[in-house]
Amino acid sequence: MFIAMDNNQKRWNCMEEIPAVTEGPFYCLACHSPVRLKNGSVLRAHFAHVKLQHCPYHHEAESFEHLELKASLYDWASKESHTEVESYLADFQQIADLLVVDKNLALEVQCSPLSLERLKERSDAYRANGYQVYWLLGKKLWLKERLTKLQAG
């Protein structure tokens, strides 16, 4: 995740400003569990749960591909429109990877398999709350020789 908050409720966005470790401790915006700043040489700076099992919104660690796609989309969309990354939508308890606020548009990056039921549930929730949603698929989910169950829908 790219967004976390500190003890003073300040939101930190690692794509805009990488905080010093001394600015922490940091917490997940959704579950308020501790997260740590990771700023190594392989992955771009991001936050990760200290213990992931406590967060109902982040079920697994985000892959390199997921982080990079989300960051690239944010860089692109934020040039033209007010865009928020990892925006928590309290009305239906969903975290949008990217939310283009002035267009009521949610952009979701999906790099790992997702059941058709869960995809429909999340898409329906966005639409019921006035958002248009686009799902952008990582390479593992691209169409190969035949349709997967999810693609056949």
Ranges and model annotations:
Residues 16-20, 37, 72-106, 114:
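Active-site metal-binding core of divalent-cation-utilizing nuclease and nuclease-like domains
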Residues 60-61, 107-110:
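Short, contiguous strand/loop micro-motifs
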Residues 41, 65, 90-93, 118:
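Short secondary-structure boundary/capping elements
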Residues 1-76:
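N-terminal cysteine/histidine-rich coordination modules
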